[in-house]
């Protein structure tokens, strides 16, 4: 159905490796279950793709280090999606950020 909506001008992939090997793709957005984030990020960097990844970056510190090593080795950009970090509401939970900041700065 999605293909009909865009008149057959987008590609559908059943395997992420096919997507990252596509020369028409410049950047990948990783929005999969967290256990895939590290694997996909490393492979995307190796394939020369810049990466936009949803939280959490990886499941472990070791996986995160491997991602950063791959990003540096292959000269790619990595961006972790951190929406609502700088808005009036903290992560959309209805908690104002400024009172929290004052509380932290007060030393409590």
Where are these regions (language model features)?
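A contiguous active-site-proximal alpha/beta segment in oxidoreductase catalytic domains
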Residues: 50-54, 58-108
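N-terminal glycine-/serine-/threonine-rich beta1-alpha1-beta2 phosphate-ribose binding loop
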Residues: 1-53, 62-77
């Amino acid at each position: 159905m999605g293909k009909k909506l865009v008149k057959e001008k987008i590609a559908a992939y059943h395997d992420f490796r096919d997507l990252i090997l596509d020369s028409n793709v410049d950047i990948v957005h990783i929005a999969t279950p967290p256990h895939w984030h590290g694997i996909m990020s490393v492979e995307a960097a190796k394939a020369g793709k810049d990466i936009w990844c949803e939280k959490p970056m990886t499941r472990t510190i070791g996986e995160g280090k491997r991602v950063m090593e791959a990003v540096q080795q292959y000269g790619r950009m990595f961006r972790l999606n951190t929406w609502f970090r700088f808005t009036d509401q903290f992560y959309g939970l209805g908690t104002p950020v400024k009172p929290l900041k004052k509380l932290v700065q007060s030393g409590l």
